[in-house]
């Protein structure tokens, strides 16, 4: 942001009636985070010293959702138009700073476009973001005389001739704070809507002989607002398409870019292959030669080089070292870590557990609060019984242990290295090195047994 432009105002007080939702409009998610958060992030990327958020409808929930943000909260108790919203923010302006005005429901506005807008703002004048549309219906029109911007006329107030203008107002502008205060104080609501229009400051500035410079966005999607769920879904697709394009150009192989969702940040190595319907959330790192199967969900995780995640696997807040294989239909819950070449197979769930180098849990297993050494085999149907209804307890399994199928390990329990646990065993006591442990009921054979037969009705 330029030296003089140090504050941003984000207008986010609208009700969002056409969303048909109890959730404030600006909190609806785009790419996994609230629309308004995208705008806040862009403001911060510009280096804004102050971000004033004008809020109203659903204010408590908005404050709660954004409680970790460094914002100046400005209440607009009544929604009487964009001009009225800015009047609430005006007392917070420093006289010598420029004010950039953004909107909480215009989430895709880019920092590069705003940098150009800030650069063209004339001294004492206004920098205005406009766009040329084939169909400008619904937008305020830019009125010019001899090529100079003289005002903005809203659709409902425009004449038939003015409605033919195809240069439209995006609502985004930058002006000096002291000038804005003066112009805002002169607004009236003498219009069809009975509202105070921020756009009227353009005509007021022109009357004072101030220059208004207009620039266009780099992409039209940057100025598109959201009034309903259809528009939100359209922007979601635009955003995802842009993310997919960037990944493809960076060397990630998306087998179908139209069926990939990035809802966070993806750091990747070389020769990564991602199949269809994969969702990336939070901060995810994929090493070299990683393969992600169809239908996987990865959230806040690190996947080491040469690892393969098979279809329909969920990995959250977990880490894999080099050469791991996981899935299909596996779930790694928060706190799971796989060492080099560890294997977690189908219908295996891990939580707060470590699986050592070369160890395997092939199928139908729950490993919770477990620390498992290297080269361990976990048989099908094994369960670490880690919860007594009040507290969680740890299971520790040493290197080279063989755990037979259908084993229950009742924590807290320690299985020393080299031990063997027979199938169907319930382990309730610690096991020493190289011991064989079996606990089963005696198998009984009853000759001539006849099954019960239902009586005929």
Swiss-Prot record:
<dbReference type="GO" id="GO:0005737">
    <property type="term" value="C:cytoplasm"/>
</dbReference>
<feature type="binding site">
    <location>
        <begin position="11"/>
        <end position="14"/>
    </location>
    <ligand>
        <name>UDP-N-acetyl-alpha-D-glucosamine</name>
    </ligand>
</feature>
<dbReference type="GO" id="GO:0019134">
    <property type="term" value="F:glucosamine-1-phosphate N-acetyltransferase activity"/>
</dbReference>
<feature type="binding site">
    <location>
        <begin position="81"/>
        <end position="82"/>
    </location>
    <ligand>
        <name>UDP-N-acetyl-alpha-D-glucosamine</name>
    </ligand>
</feature>
<keyword id="KW-0573">Peptidoglycan synthesis</keyword>
<feature type="binding site">
    <location>
        <position position="366"/>
    </location>
    <ligand>
        <name>UDP-N-acetyl-alpha-D-glucosamine</name>
    </ligand>
</feature>
<comment type="similarity">
    <text>In the N-terminal section; belongs to the N-acetylglucosamine-1-phosphate uridyltransferase family.</text>
</comment>
<feature type="binding site">
    <location>
        <begin position="386"/>
        <end position="387"/>
    </location>
    <ligand>
        <name>acetyl-CoA</name>
    </ligand>
</feature>
<dbReference type="InterPro" id="IPR050065">
    <property type="entry name" value="GlmU-like"/>
</dbReference>
<feature type="binding site">
    <location>
        <position position="423"/>
    </location>
    <ligand>
        <name>acetyl-CoA</name>
    </ligand>
</feature>
<keyword id="KW-0479">Metal-binding</keyword>
<dbReference type="InterPro" id="IPR011004">
    <property type="entry name" value="Trimer_LpxA-like_sf"/>
</dbReference>
<comment type="pathway">
    <text>Nucleotide-sugar biosynthesis; UDP-N-acetyl-alpha-D-glucosamine biosynthesis; N-acetyl-alpha-D-glucosamine 1-phosphate from alpha-D-glucosamine 6-phosphate (route II): step 2/2.</text>
</comment>
<dbReference type="GO" id="GO:0000902">
    <property type="term" value="P:cell morphogenesis"/>
</dbReference>
<feature type="binding site">
    <location>
        <position position="76"/>
    </location>
    <ligand>
        <name>UDP-N-acetyl-alpha-D-glucosamine</name>
    </ligand>
</feature>
<dbReference type="InterPro" id="IPR005882">
    <property type="entry name" value="Bifunctional_GlmU"/>
</dbReference>
<feature type="active site" description="Proton acceptor">
    <location>
        <position position="363"/>
    </location>
</feature>
<dbReference type="GO" id="GO:0009245">
    <property type="term" value="P:lipid A biosynthetic process"/>
</dbReference>
<dbReference type="GO" id="GO:0008360">
    <property type="term" value="P:regulation of cell shape"/>
</dbReference>
<feature type="binding site">
    <location>
        <position position="380"/>
    </location>
    <ligand>
        <name>acetyl-CoA</name>
    </ligand>
</feature>
<dbReference type="GO" id="GO:0016020">
    <property type="term" value="C:membrane"/>
</dbReference>
<comment type="subunit">
    <text>Homotrimer.</text>
</comment>
<keyword id="KW-0460">Magnesium</keyword>
<dbReference type="GO" id="GO:0009252">
    <property type="term" value="P:peptidoglycan biosynthetic process"/>
</dbReference>
<feature type="binding site">
    <location>
        <position position="154"/>
    </location>
    <ligand>
        <name>UDP-N-acetyl-alpha-D-glucosamine</name>
    </ligand>
</feature>
<feature type="binding site">
    <location>
        <position position="25"/>
    </location>
    <ligand>
        <name>UDP-N-acetyl-alpha-D-glucosamine</name>
    </ligand>
</feature>
<feature type="binding site">
    <location>
        <position position="227"/>
    </location>
    <ligand>
        <name>Mg(2+)</name>
    </ligand>
</feature>
<keyword id="KW-0133">Cell shape</keyword>
<feature type="binding site">
    <location>
        <position position="405"/>
    </location>
    <ligand>
        <name>acetyl-CoA</name>
    </ligand>
</feature>
<feature type="binding site">
    <location>
        <begin position="103"/>
        <end position="105"/>
    </location>
    <ligand>
        <name>UDP-N-acetyl-alpha-D-glucosamine</name>
    </ligand>
</feature>
<dbReference type="Pfam" id="PF12804">
    <property type="entry name" value="NTP_transf_3"/>
</dbReference>
<feature type="region of interest" description="N-acetyltransferase">
    <location>
        <begin position="251"/>
        <end position="457"/>
    </location>
</feature>
<comment type="function">
    <text>Catalyzes the last two sequential reactions in the de novo biosynthetic pathway for UDP-N-acetylglucosamine (UDP-GlcNAc). The C-terminal domain catalyzes the transfer of acetyl group from acetyl coenzyme A to glucosamine-1-phosphate (GlcN-1-P) to produce N-acetylglucosamine-1-phosphate (GlcNAc-1-P), which is converted into UDP-GlcNAc by the transfer of uridine 5-monophosphate (from uridine 5-triphosphate), a reaction catalyzed by the N-terminal domain.</text>
</comment>
<keyword id="KW-0677">Repeat</keyword>
<feature type="binding site">
    <location>
        <position position="227"/>
    </location>
    <ligand>
        <name>UDP-N-acetyl-alpha-D-glucosamine</name>
    </ligand>
</feature>
<dbReference type="GO" id="GO:0006048">
    <property type="term" value="P:UDP-N-acetylglucosamine biosynthetic process"/>
</dbReference>
<comment type="similarity">
    <text>In the C-terminal section; belongs to the transferase hexapeptide repeat family.</text>
</comment>
<feature type="binding site">
    <location>
        <position position="377"/>
    </location>
    <ligand>
        <name>UDP-N-acetyl-alpha-D-glucosamine</name>
    </ligand>
</feature>
<dbReference type="InterPro" id="IPR038009">
    <property type="entry name" value="GlmU_C_LbH"/>
</dbReference>
<protein>
    <recommendedName>
        <fullName>Bifunctional protein GlmU</fullName>
        <ecNumber>2.7.7.23</ecNumber>
        <ecNumber>2.3.1.157</ecNumber>
    </recommendedName>
</protein>
<dbReference type="GO" id="GO:0071555">
    <property type="term" value="P:cell wall organization"/>
</dbReference>
<feature type="region of interest" description="Linker">
    <location>
        <begin position="230"/>
        <end position="250"/>
    </location>
</feature>
């Amino acid at each position: 942001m330029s030296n003089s432009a140090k504050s941003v105002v984000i207008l986010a007080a609208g009700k969002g009636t056409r969303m048909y939702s109890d959730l404030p409009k600006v909190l609806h998610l785009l790419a996994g985070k609230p629309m308004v958060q995208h705008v806040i992030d862009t403001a911060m990327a510009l280096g804004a010293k102050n971000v004033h958020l004008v809020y109203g409808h659903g204010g408590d929930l908005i404050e709660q959702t954004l409680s970790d943000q460094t914002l100046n909260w400005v209440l607009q108790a009544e929604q009487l138009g964009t001009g009225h919203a800015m009047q609430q923010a005006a007392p917070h302006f420093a006289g010598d700073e420029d004010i950039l005005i953004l909107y909480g429901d215009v989430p895709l506005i880019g920092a590069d476009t705003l940098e150009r807008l800030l650069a063209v703002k004339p001294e004492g004048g206004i920098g205005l973001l406009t766009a040329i549309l084939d169909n400008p219906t619904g937008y305020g029109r830019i009125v010019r005389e001899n090529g100079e911007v003289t005002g903005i006329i809203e659709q409902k107030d425009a004449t038939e001739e003015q409605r033919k203008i195809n240069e439209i107002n995006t609502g985004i502008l930058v002006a000096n704070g002291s000038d804005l205060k003066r112009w805002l104080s002169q607004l009236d609501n003498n219009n069809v809507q009975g509202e105070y229009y921020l756009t009227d400051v353009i005509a007021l500035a022109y009357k004072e002989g101030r220059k208004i410079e207009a620039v266009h966005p780099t992409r039209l999607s940057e100025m598109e607002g959201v009034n309903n769920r259809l528009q939100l879904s359209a922007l979601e697709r635009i955003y995802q398409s842009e993310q997919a394009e960037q990944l493809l150009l960076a060397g990630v192989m998306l087998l179908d870019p139209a069926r990939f969702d990035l809802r966070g940040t993806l750091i990747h190595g070389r020769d990564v292959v991602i199949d269809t319907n994969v969702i990336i959330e939070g901060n995810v790192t994929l090493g070299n030669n990683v393969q992600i199967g169809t239908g996987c969900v990865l959230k806040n995780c690190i996947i080491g080089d040469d690892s393969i995640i098979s279809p329909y696997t969920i990995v959250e807040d977990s880490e894999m070292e080099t050469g791991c294989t996981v899935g299909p239909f596996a779930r790694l819950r928060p706190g799971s870590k796989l060492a080099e070449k560890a294997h977690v197979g189908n219908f295996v769930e891990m939580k707060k557990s470590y699986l050592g180098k070369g160890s395997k849990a092939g199928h139908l297993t729950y490993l919770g609060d477990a620390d498992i050494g290297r080269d361990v085999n976990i048989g099908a149907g094994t369960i670490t019984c880690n919860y007594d209804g009040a507290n969680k307890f740890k299971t520790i399994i040493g290197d080279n242990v063989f755990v037979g199928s259908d084993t229950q390990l009742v924590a807290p329990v320690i299985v020393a290295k080299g031990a063997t646990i027979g199938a169907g065993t319930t382990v309730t006591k610690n096991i020493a090195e190289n011991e064989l442990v079996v606990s089963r009921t005696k198998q009984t054979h009853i000759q001539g047994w006849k099954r019960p037969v239902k009586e005929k009705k």
